[in-house]
């Protein structure tokens, strides 16, 4: 079976709550680090989530 291009990433909250989302991204079309504004349920606000490594 062929190995896919998409790689799992972890989106960490910039609010410092420890909350994170996991998603996948295509490394070939998006080589830079991902930043998305998403909802953080701990602080109950939309904050910026930055890409980090899955441990």
UniProtKB/Swiss-Prot annotation:
The keyword Ribonucleoprotein is annotated on this UniProt entry: yes
Coiled coil: none
Gene3D superfamilies: Ribosomal protein L33
PANTHER family given in the database record: 54S RIBOSOMAL PROTEIN L39, MITOCHONDRIAL (PTHR15238), LARGE RIBOSOMAL SUBUNIT PROTEIN BL33M (PTHR15238:SF1)
HAMAP family, per database record: Ribosomal_bL33
Family assignment from sequence similarity: Belongs to the bacterial ribosomal protein bL33 family.
Protein's recorded name: Large ribosomal subunit protein bL33
Organism of this sequence: Aeromonas hydrophila subsp. hydrophila (strain ATCC 7966 / DSM 30187 / BCRC 13018 / CCUG 14551 / JCM 1027 / KCTC 2358 / NCIMB 9240 / NCTC 8049)
Lineage: Bacteria, Pseudomonadati, Pseudomonadota, Gammaproteobacteria, Aeromonadales
Encoding gene, per UniProt annotation: rpmG
């Amino acid at each position: 079976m062929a190995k896919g291009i998409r790689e799992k990433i972890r989106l960490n909250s910039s609010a410092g709550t420890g909350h994170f989302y996991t998603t996948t991204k295509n490394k070939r079309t998006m080589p830079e680090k991902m930043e998305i504004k998403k909802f953080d349920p701990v602080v109950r606000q939309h904050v910026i989530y930055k890409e980090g490594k899955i441990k």
